[in-house]
């Protein structure tokens, strides 16, 4: 119910806003970078919103590693990991060098370490995922068919609009998790922090390592600055490895334009 209500409120705010029409600045950024994708940018109160490619913004897609945001809270709630626990690397060399070592929750989140979160998923189990995803209203809440990969290549889907609605509930601490879990997640989500602003975010890349699958890049999070909180969700088609950096670049360019990031 919460998920549907949050999406309804966000959609209503967008429809009532003059920003619902294709935003010229956002469209220009995507066009200049030759990117097919979408971006939703919304203030906490939902009154001020900017969008690019409204149809794609409402299209549910695999969340990939952006699911590490709720997954971290679910793992802490299930007590399968603690803040200072370390999981031992199994010695298998994987494609990302930062994954080839022992991992803590913070290092695994920041490096987007797949094997670490898959190990947590084995401990969490399908039944707990099913109940937790329904309880927090994340996307379509379908954790199948495999409990260790449903966010990478399974049935779970979420749209950019739903990502923003979920992040707002996360920020307001409306989800059923302990304060200590919220505080830990807030800390490990920090990408950049200055006296003027704090940026918390997570990347994702659905289809990574599988060229037969659709390649979908994500960047979701929120920016706290000058008494305001801006929430964003970008997804885009990834056509080449160099596109990975465009996820962050596009969002940062938009934040500089719309959120007065450096004022």
Regions found by a protein language model. Give the residues of each.
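Positively charged n-region of N-terminal signal peptides that target proteins for export
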Residues: 1-4
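Bacterial N-terminal signal peptides
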Residues: 6-15
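Beta-lactamase-like hydrolase cores
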Residues: 18-62
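Structured C-terminal helix/loop/strand segments within mature extracytoplasmic catalytic/sensor domains
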Residues: 21-29, 33, 122-127, 174-198, ...
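Active-site SXXK
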Residues: 60-84, 108, 232
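Short, well-structured active-site flanking segments
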Residues: 77-92, 177-181
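Acidic helix-start/capping segments at beta-turn-to-alpha-helix junctions
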Residues: 86-101, 105-110, 124-125
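Mid-domain, small-residue-enriched loop/turn segments at the edges of structured enzyme/sensor domains
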Residues: 97, 104-105, 117-172
């Amino acid at each position: 119910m919460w998920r549907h209500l949050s999406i309804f409120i966000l959609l209503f705010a967008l429809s009532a806003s003059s920003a619902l029409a294709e935003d010229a600045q956002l469209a220009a950024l995507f066009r200049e970078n030759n990117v097919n994708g979408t971006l939703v940018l919304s203030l906490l109160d939902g009154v001020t919103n900017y969008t690019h490619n409204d149809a794609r913004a409402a299209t549910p897609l695999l969340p990939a590693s952006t699911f590490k945001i709720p997954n971290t809270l679910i793992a802490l709630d299930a007590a399968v990991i603690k803040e200072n626990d370390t999981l031992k690397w199994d010695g298998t060399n994987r494609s990302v060098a930062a994954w080839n070592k022992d991992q803590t929750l913070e290092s695994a989140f920041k490096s987007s370490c797949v094997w670490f979160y898959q190990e947590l998923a084995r401990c969490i189990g399908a039944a707990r995922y099913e109940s937790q995803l329904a309880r927090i209203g994340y996307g379509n809440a379908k954790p199948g068919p495999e409990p260790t990969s449903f966010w990478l290549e399974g049935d779970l889907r979420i749209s950019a609009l739903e990502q923003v609605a979920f992040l707002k509930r996360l920020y307001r601490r409306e989800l059923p998790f302990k304060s200590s879990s919220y505080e830990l997640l807030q800390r490990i989500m920090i990408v950049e922090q200055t006296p003027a602003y704090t940026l918390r975010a997570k990347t994702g890349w659905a289809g990574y390592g599988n060229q037969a699958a659709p390649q979908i890049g994500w960047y979701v999070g929120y920016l706290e600055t000058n008494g305001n909180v801006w929430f964003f969700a970008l997804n885009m088609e990834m056509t080449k490895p160099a596109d990975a950096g465009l996820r962050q670049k596009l969002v940062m360019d938009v934040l500089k334009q719309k959120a007065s990031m450096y004022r």
